[in-house]
Amino acid sequence: MGPPSACPHRECIPWQGLLLTASLLTFWNAPTTAWLFIASAPFEVAEGENVHLSVVYLPENLYSYGWYKGKTVEPNQLIAAYVIDTHVRTPGPAYSGRETISPSGDLHFQNVTLEDTGYYNLQVTYRNSQIEQASHHLRVYESVAQPSIQASSTTVTEKGSVVLTCHTNNTGTSFQWIFNNQRLQVTKRMKLSWFNHVLTIDPIRQEDAGEYQCEVSNPVSSNRSDPLKLTVKSDDNTLGILIGVLVGSLLVAALVCFLLLRKTGRASDQSDFREQQPPASTPGHGPSDSSIS
């Protein structure tokens, strides 16, 4: 007796062939999903602006479509639905009164808030009752408020260190440091924290004195802090050493001059004394006795 899966008649089609045929029919009847795409205008949205979620390449033979808020399509997350043939718009539980759904499938928001950040799903229903979905993540940014700078000290002695911290109440921002109204050129003596909101200078030099600002920004706005003036004092020890070296050099130079002058004076006195002495008589050269008459 043959296996149960064997086909006793020549007209019988193997189950693998039926499965392949069903897969091909399903692929043939299913609407294409490659062109259903949602675009946001503007792409980066600031709090209080209007935003338009448009459907790119909307398929044909549609019966209706609906917009949902959230990662999944749930009845309680329906914003609004639209039936194409009857032009009937039906608001859902997630409708806030600021959304408008158009006959072309677009969703228009007015005066968006931070709470509008999240996923939005478009579900389209074809006339053959098949369903297709597309998702888009909307990010709403808040306008950046003015930050502030806190310094470990505003007057620092040369060769010391200072820590500058930028404070902001906004989240999702980037930090940039400004020195004398220009972007700070970070040197080997400077260290930035992971998010750049803390600047450490060690050791500090006279060239680091000036006005510092921090700038915070997000994709839709930016703001700078008030200037903070940093004063760098000279190192007293270094100044004392320099003064000591200078005074010592002057004393050594004065001593050398004194010794030279003294040596020169002694040589001059000896020369004058020699010139004032009478010449000494030579022995045996006195007056001869024979000359006396």
UniProtKB/Swiss-Prot annotation:
Disulfide bonds join 166-214. Residues 262-293 are cytoplasmic. Residues 267-293 are annotated as: Disordered. It is found in: Membrane. It is a single-pass type I membrane protein. The chain crosses the membrane at residues 241-261. Glycans are attached at residue 111. Residues 1-34 form the signal peptide. GO terms for cellular component: external side of plasma membrane. It comes from the Eukaryota. Gene3D superfamilies: Immunoglobulins (2.60.40.10). Residues 147-231 form the Ig-like C2-type domain. InterPro entries: CEA_cell_adhesion, Ig-like_dom, Ig-like_dom_sf, Ig-like_fold, Ig_sub, Ig_sub2, Ig_V-set. Residues 35-240 are extracellular. Keywords: Disulfide bond, Glycoprotein, Immunoglobulin domain, Membrane, Signal, Transmembrane, Transmembrane helix. One of its GO terms (biological process) is T cell activation. Belongs to the immunoglobulin superfamily. CEA family. PANTHER family: CARCINOEMBRYONIC ANTIGEN-RELATED CELL ADHESION MOLECULE 1, CARCINOEMBRYONIC ANTIGEN-RELATED CELL ADHESION MOLECULE 19. This is Cell adhesion molecule CEACAM21. It comes from Homo sapiens (Human).
